Structure formats: structure tokens, C-alpha cells
């Protein structure tokens, strides 16, 4: 089987969820995230993916990282592969992320959920429950930009799997 193409006869539609602390509201980053998610959703069905979506959680009491972890955990769809975004996580190339998503889909995973913490990151207990930890490099990024970067990489993954000219090596 080609890691970049859907299996013949694949009927399972694997969802992709981005769960993030805080709300972008009407910030420019919200427009970018929405744009990339919409673009992925238009291509994803051709590849056997369900819809990608963004779930934003907000600790209105300001209780901190532990309260954020509880809200994030409640937002994770059942039977989901959990990937935390963390500066100490594994760095992947764009084609590697595309292969990862294709492998999850081909192994009939229900959903892949990416978790993005707030200003203090993700609570250690929740990190330990994750199946994977991914990083955008050793630099720390604001959670609003991390959402944009992740949404773009998910869309880019679809373009890689479909072999469109969007991604150039």
C-alpha cells in the first residue's frame, strides 16, 4: 500500500480535531484557522477523512493549567488518538505528518485529536495520557499561532496525500 494514498475500499471516515485553550474570537488568526480547516474539509473526503474541526475551551475562573487540562480532556472525542503539541515533542516533516494521518486512517482510528495548551502549556498528567507529543521546533509559539500552523499542516497533509502542487519538496 502507498502510504500517501487511501486504501482501496476504505469506507471509514476518520475525524481530526484541534482542541485548544482560549478563544480566538474575531482575531485574524481565527480567520486563518477557519480557512485552512475549510480547505482541508473540501479535500479530506477524497482521502477517506471525516471533517476536521476546532474545539475551543476556556477556563473562565482563571483556575490555571489543571482546570484547563480537565476542560481539554472533556473535549476529546471518544476513541481518539491524542497528540499534544509540546516544545519537547517530536518534530515531524510535513510528509511525515501526512503519513501519520494516513496510517491512523488506514488503521481505522476513529479520530486524531491535537491538543494545544494555553500560556502555561499542557498539564503533565494530560501529557502522559497522550499517545504522541509533537513539536513545531524548540521555539515556543503563542497558542493562537500554533493553531494556525497546525491547521495549515493538516491541510498540507491532505495536499501531500493527493499529490497536489501546494506542497513542494
Model regions: which residues?
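N-terminal beta1-alpha1 ligand-phosphate binding loop
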Residues: 9-44
Amino acid at each position: 500500500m502507498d502510504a500517501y494514498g487511501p486504501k482501496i475500499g476504505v469506507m471509514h471516515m476518520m475525524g481530526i480535531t484541534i482542541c485548544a485553550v482560549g478563544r480566538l474570537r474575531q482575531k485574524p488568526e481565527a480567520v486563518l484557522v477557519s480557512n485552512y480547516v475549510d480547505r482541508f474539509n473540501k479535500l479530506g473526503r477524497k482521502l477517506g477523512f471525516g471533517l476536521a474541526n476546532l474545539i475551543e475551551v476556556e477556563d473562565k475562573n482563571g483556575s490555571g493549567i489543571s482546570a484547563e487540562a480537565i476542560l481539554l480532556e472533556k473535549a476529546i472525542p471518544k476513541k481518539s488518538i491524542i497528540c499534544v503539541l509540546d516544545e519537547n515533542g517530536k518534530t515531524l516533516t510535513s510528509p511525515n505528518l501526512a503519513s501519520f494521518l494516513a496510517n491512523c486512517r488506514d488503521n481505522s482510528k476513529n479520530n486524531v485529536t491535537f491538543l494545544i495548551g494555553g500560556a502555561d502549556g499542557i498539564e503533565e498528567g494530560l501529557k502522559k495520557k497522550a499517545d504522541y507529543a509533537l513539536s513545531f521546533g524548540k521555539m515556543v509559539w503563542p497558542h493562537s499561532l500554533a493553531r494556525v500552523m497546525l491547521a495549515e499542516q493538516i491541510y498540507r497533509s491532505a495536499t501531500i496525500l493527493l499529490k497536489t502542487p501546494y506542497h513542494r519538496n
